[in-house]
Design a protein with these regions (language model features):
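Periplasmic peptidoglycan-binding/tethering modules of Gram-negative envelope proteins
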Residues: 1-38, 93-96, 100-109
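Periplasmic OmpA-like peptidoglycan-binding domain that tethers envelope proteins to the cell wall
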Residues: 19-21, 44-109
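Conserved phosphate/oxyanion-binding catalytic-loop motifs
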Residues: 41
Length: 109
């Protein structure tokens, strides 16, 4: 079983807006209710900016979500894999690619 949650960011930013916190909380709630579950957070950037900048922002976006899970929701950091994936191309609209995608992997059957 898996669950996905998408956290969006403003251009050039890697801080999680208050409006996005429910999407982080969904992940935290799931992890707290399923102690064997882990989450991969993949940060992405939209295409403007240099590759170096985009890779840094993408990683920072993943880390920002991880920080909230660890600090606010007391999720063990070892259950969270935060990755920067550079420029995203999942969505046709470039602006929509400013995201962290949280994919929960639940080993429970």
């Amino acid at each position: 079983r898996s669950m996905e949650s998408v956290v969006t960011f403003r251009q050039g930013k890697s801080t999680v807006d208050n409006a996005q916190l429910p999407n982080v909380e969904r992940v935290a709630t799931y992890l707290n209710n399923h102690k064997d579950a882990t989450v991969i957070i993949r940060g992405f950037a939209s295409p403007e900016g240099s590759q170096e900048v985009n890779e840094r922002i993408a990683k920072a976006r993943a880390e920002a979500v991880k920080d909230i899970l660890v600090k606010r929701y007391r999720i063990n950091a070892s259950r969270i894999d935060a990755q920067g994936n550079g420029v995203g191309d999942m969505f046709s609209e470039p602006d929509w690619n400013r995201v962290s995608i949280c994919t929960i992997d639940d080993k429970e059957k």
